[in-house]
Amino acid sequence: MASLGVNIDHIANVREARKTFEPDPVKMVLLAELGGADGITVHLREDRRHIQDRDLNLLKETVHTRLNLEMAATEEMTSIALNLKPDIVTLVPEKREEVTTEGGLDVIKNKRKLKEIIQRLSGEDIPVSLFVDPVQAQLENCAEVKAAWVELHTGKYAITKKKARDLELSILKESTAKAKSYGLRVNAGHGLTYQNVEPIAAIEGIEELNIGHTIISRALSVGLSQAVKEMKSLIINPRKDNFLL
């Protein structure tokens, strides 16, 4: 059974829209954990558009489950991670003009830099995950740079309509098996919703799903704890063929 990492970036988005002090993503963590979150995910972007450095420091002290820090593979972010010591770091691609992360890391192109960063973080007992597209060549290189985890990008699956979704699901299943054969542990995320999560949750070998936007959206209607509970129930007892789009 996959666990659930709740991404709270969108809570910070609301706060930063007015550059004020509320809503406070740090305070919302307790509600997410009460609802059953197995971990908390935040992305500290280079432009600080939502999560701020102060949030990170407070989250390190208040998260009772585990803290997953998403970040770009830069010297600044590596230094922050080494000082913070989150439970895991997920390296993601980042473009200032994008609304959200648009694709996976190109591990092949950035192999030397990624290997160096992974060595530095791993040397301080911080495991590293690489957010990648479900492509065999990328997975092979994830293993070669000594990543402990990969997070498979589910974005293409998430936007696919009925006729093509089985193919995307098959690719994710095959990629999970391939990653594990390379000794990698596997997470997945991006674009997952209450309507499309169950087939992904049913894939054998995926250990955690990182989900944010749909949970925060649902929380506006039912509250954060209930929104997390509803998502957790779908992940615990997934129906392999349930895709409601």
From Swiss-Prot:
PANTHER family: PYRIDOXINE 5'-PHOSPHATE SYNTHASE. Keywords: Cytoplasm, Pyridoxine biosynthesis, Transferase. This is Pyridoxine 5'-phosphate synthase. It is found in: Cytoplasm. 1-deoxy-D-xylulose 5-phosphate binds at D9, H10, R45, H50, T100. It comes from Prochlorococcus marinus (strain NATL2A). Catalyzes the complicated ring closure reaction between the two acyclic compounds 1-deoxy-D-xylulose-5-phosphate (DXP) and 3-amino-2-oxopropyl phosphate (1-amino-acetone-3-phosphate or AAP) to form pyridoxine 5'-phosphate (PNP) and inorganic phosphate. Pfam families: PdxJ (PF03740). GO terms for cellular component: cytosol. Homooctamer; tetramer of dimers.
